[in-house]
From Swiss-Prot:
GO cellular component terms attached to this protein's record: chloroplast
Record-level Gene Ontology MF annotations: ribulose-bisphosphate carboxylase activity
Misc remark: In this alga, in contrast to plants, the small subunit is encoded in the chloroplast.
Cited SUPFAM superfamilies: RuBisCO, small subunit
Entry keyword annotation includes Chloroplast: yes
Superkingdom field: Eukaryota
Protein known as: Ribulose bisphosphate carboxylase small subunit
Family in the record: Belongs to the RuBisCO small chain family.
Any one of the GO BP annotations: reductive pentose-phosphate cycle
Organism name: Guillardia theta (Cryptophyte)
Amino acid sequence: MRLTQGAFSFLPDLTDEQIVKQIQYAISKNWALNVEWTDDPHPRNAYWDLWGLPLFGIKDPAAVMFEINACRKAKPACYVKVNAFDNSRGVESCCLSFIVQRPTSNEPGFQLIRSEVDSRNIRYTIQSYASTRPEGERY
């Protein structure tokens, strides 16, 4: 099952040329960029690990692509995404986020977990099959 987080997640994976165009768009808006990675595929996982430092005042997409490729090389079995932030109002609000790499192996999908709670109510949650393995060994 394909993880869907951020823009373009229902489309085929972006090529490097398409990624550069999105980075150029973010640069044209004076947005700060950063690269993040994770091996925890839960759809509500908002706490990805930051790769390097945020890229403020970048004028050339090559600098961002360098960081993306370094992260891809170091973390080939992880998800990698790019975030663009607008700090024009003094608040770092995410304006654009998209996945630039998925694990090299198949994404195993999610299991539905049912829990009976008070008054016979049922609560549902999902858990990735990949998260049953320890961090760093999921893909």
